[in-house]
Amino acid sequence: AADDAGILAAIKKNQRALIRRALQTDLTTHIETDNTDFYQIYSESLRNLGTPVFAKKLIDALQQAFPADTEILTIRQQGAAVSSVFNFYYQGQVLPYYGGGKPIARELKSNDFMYYQLMCHAKANKECHFFDFGRSKLDSGAYSYKKHWGMQNQLLHYQFKLIKAEQLSNLSPNNPKYQLFIKMWQKLPLAISRWLGPKLAHFLG
């Protein structure tokens, strides 16, 4: 697509309607280096999904190691951050790697607005021609969401080397034995989930 209008036209009809609705609101787009609001939103999103979050120092380290190739795009409503995504840029590609939204994001359509704004920004200001929406397991919720955008999927294979284990552990959140943990984690106060999450996250792969 050559411009913002072309990008919007390339998106599937139903998803395009959500973006157009968001474009009529008071949502604003901000390119940032300060990761405070991003981490607050991302860690809350993971808590709400029942997943431990990694330490904020990982984002600090990524920004320090790749200062020219990372960027945060945050969507705000009346100054308050409602959605935010941490992105990598590589050889004409933008990769929205870590993203999330406040609970109100669903009502505001701010996540949809955010990814569209990222596409436009990456095209206009970063000379990107490819939007890599990342890997998702077939028929998962994330896969369905990306499919609604009209993304072209490419089959990728996972490879594992077992060191001591005789078989691969099922770490999928769909594994029934994790359901109780997920439900308990969703009920944790944010401060506790942000403190305890990094202590557990590195065990989850």
Regions found by a protein language model. Give the residues of each.
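Generic detector of bulky aromatic hydrophobic side chains
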Residues: A1, A17, T51, L62, ...
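Active-site/acyl-donor-binding loops of N-acyltransferases
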Residues: A1-A5, F131-G205
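A conserved beta-strand-loop-helix scaffold within acyl/acetyltransferase catalytic domains
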Residues: A1-E107, C120-A122
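Surface-exposed loop/turn and secondary-structure junction residues enriched for glycine/proline
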Residues: A10-N14, K57, Y97, K109, ...
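A sequence-level detector of short, solvent-exposed, charge-rich linear segments
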Residues: D26, H30, K57-Q64, Y115, ...
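Low-complexity, flexible helical/coil segments
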Residues: H30-N35, Q63-A68, L108-N111, A122-N125, ...
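Phenylalanine-focused residue identity feature
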Residues: F38, F54, F66, F86-Y90, ...
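Acyl-donor binding region in acyl/amide transferases
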Residues: Q91-L155
